[in-house]
């Protein structure tokens, strides 16, 4: 009887040891760099504001941005308010116009056109379209580039490079314009 019991126990142990280990459920992947930019575009276009975002608007957009860019927005808003206090009859910088694209009037729509990502940074080219408000016909198209960094929660927008090639379109990067406005508060 002991031999039967020992054989049974041996067979049971062999069967159990061959069973594959259950691995934990895979974590849901963080959004891609392109997904982050698409989500930002949806959030921003639903807000429809111009110039620097106020505190409430900035809070809505903040989850899309890196800590560095969020700090630049806070500093630029403080610089803008300091400028208003010093020069109440002057129009402060970044008070109107679309600061998230090359076109002052803003885009009617934007979509991710190309993504180039490495382990820690990504570049996402967005194709923007501006439609004539009366006819709805596209009258301007252009690319701009979003620069992202990988944060703890995934990809975060760290800057925007203006690529519009017409007269009076902004040049350079959003971070530079924010820094210049922030310096007005010093």
Residue ranges and their predicted role:
Residues 1-4:
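Positively charged n-region of N-terminal signal peptides that target proteins for export
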Residues 26-94:
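Core segments of small alpha/beta cavity-forming domains
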Residues 66-136:
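Surface-exposed, charged secondary-structure patches
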Residues 28-33, 50-53, 61, 116, ...:
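Extracytoplasmic/periplasmic, Sec-exported soluble proteins
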Residues 121-125, 129-144, 151, 156-186:
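Low-complexity, intrinsically disordered terminal/linker segments enriched in charged
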Residues 13-15:
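C-terminal motif of bacterial Sec signal peptides marking the signal peptidase cleavage site
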Residues 17-20:
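Bacterial signal peptide processing site
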């Amino acid at each position: 009887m002991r031999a039967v019991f020992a054989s049974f126990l041996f067979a049971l142990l062999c069967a159990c040891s061959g069973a594959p280990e259950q691995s934990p459920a895979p974590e849901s992947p963080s959004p891609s760099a392109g997904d982050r930019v698409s989500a930002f575009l949806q959030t921003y276009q639903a807000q429809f504001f111009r110039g620097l975002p106020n505190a409430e608007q900035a809070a809505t957009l903040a989850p899309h941005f890196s800590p560095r860019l969020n700090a630049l927005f806070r500093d630029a808003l403080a610089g803008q308010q300091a400028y208003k206090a010093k020069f109440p009859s002057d129009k402060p910088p970044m008070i109107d116009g679309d600061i998230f694209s090359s076109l002052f009037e803003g885009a009617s729509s934007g979509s991710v056109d190309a993504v180039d990502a490495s382990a820690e940074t990504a570049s996402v080219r967005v194709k923007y379209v501006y439609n004539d408000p009366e006819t709805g016909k596209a009258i301007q198209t252009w690319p701009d580039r979003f620069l992202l960094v990988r944060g703890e929660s995934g990809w975060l927008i760290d800057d925007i490079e203006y690529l519009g090639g017409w007269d009076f379109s902004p040049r350079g990067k959003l971070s530079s314009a924010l820094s210049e406005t922030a310096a007005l508060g010093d």
